[in-house]
């Protein structure tokens, strides 16, 4: 039963509020135990919430399976990310005269589809490998994190990009989209096209800072997604 969990009874616990005679009988008459479904018990960083994919994978494997989030975190920490041959091939191409490295993806620490620390590690590794121009195309989250948290993530990102620029690498935000458009999974081209045009054609152009763009969106009651 996907989504079933054990927690203290209360008004917000749908399971404890429901009438569950079959489950009550199973718990009363059959052996059972509890499994942790988040954090290090399922191969995620400590304190990181689990999700359905993580639960299915660990139960099916019968052991702790280190998730991509944990593996990439470790690669960032031990330096092996910067030594990845595929990444280094891209960094080498970006180091050529007149070239630029374009990074695109979800900008949040939701931990389901993204970790902004991975973005920072990639940008720093590219700069260390000789890239002189880095452009970040930001897909705002608002689903795995609060719906109006994006402005804070962009402010933090701009701080990292400013550090790289101070070190001699032009690092900047190229476009801002919402995941509703940029990460549509249902083949809705009318959505994806808007994010694609923002990345490829810089349409529509905005003569404003990232903070101004986000503030205008919030003022119009448009959230990050």
Language model feature labels by segment:
Residues 162, 177, 185, 189-225:
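Terminal, contiguous helix-loop blocks that mediate binding/assembly
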Residues 4-164, 170-181, 188-190, 194, ...:
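Active-site nucleophile/metal-coordination loop of metallo-enzymes that catalyze phosphate/sulfate
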